[in-house]
Amino acid sequence: MNDINLEQLHNILGRKQYPRITSLETSFLEGKKVLITGANGSIGNKLVQKLTGNNKINLLSTDISGEFERLDITDVKNVKDVVQKFDPDYLINLAGAKHAPEGEVDTWKTFSINTIGTKNLLENISSKTKLLLTSTCKSANPEIVYGASKLIAERMVLNEQGSVARFFNVVETSGNVFEIWNSIPESKPIDIAPTCERHFISLDEAVGLIIFCLNNEPGRYIVNSGPLVKMGDIADRLFPKREKTIIAPRRGDRLTEKFLSTSESIESYFLDTEIIKVKNIHD
């Protein structure tokens, strides 16, 4: 969503971007080997951009396709060859099947990538490697395959003393609703499910959360995103003069997003209150 400006971003978030989380340094990674899976995605590209800004980091960026070294996390041999050869100090798992409606249809693909893929990585890292899983707010009281697949992956990683960076909806990622709205000609109405409520964070905040997790003790972390925002209100703020067509939520979309699950609570705050460590009664 390259054409959205900072004021529009604030309108979507309902707040300004957090200054501390978006300015975290990467000096603690100097001299370390960092492997990223899923580096071709929006968050992956932004993270690669940040880490390559420090030429003292030994970075290996991978994805199943594209410009980076090939790594299919569902392919055990491929994982073994790449991960064991590089032997990273930090492994950031951004690879995943992330589209909720597709997950309800192609359930095995979603489970294979998000859950089995994470298992493959865990089984092929050495004892020195800290694994960070990027996850989703849909893992909190999951109602769909995508959320459930990520919840299982979270538990596996936490059981092995890894960390989880759980994201809310990241505004600037490819394929998001705002990108879709922007692509619709102004002469045509935009489709909205106005009562759907979501938490939002920015792309820079998502990358900042990853950096924070790498440099802190194992656990489950989220950006303190602020209150829920109704999609109808966002559409009215972004496109006050546009005609809107009201539609029902898509298959796989819940009406109200969860901040925490019913078994979770806030353990502690960091960077003032920008980041929250989440505890679960089952930890």
Model segments located where?
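Strand-loop microenvironment adjacent to phosphate/nucleotide-handling motifs in alpha/beta enzyme folds
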Residues: 6-10, 16-19, 24-28, 154, ...
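N-terminal Rossmann NAD(P)H-binding glycine-rich loop of SDR-like oxidoreductase domains
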Residues: 26-29, 33-52
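Conserved glycine-rich Rossmann-like NAD(P)H-binding loop of the short-chain dehydrogenase/reductase
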Residues: 55-66
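Conserved Rossmann-fold cofactor-binding substructure of NAD(P)-dependent oxidoreductases
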Residues: 70-88
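Conserved internal alpha-helix within the Rossmann fold of NAD(P)-dependent oxidoreductases
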Residues: 76, 118-122, 210
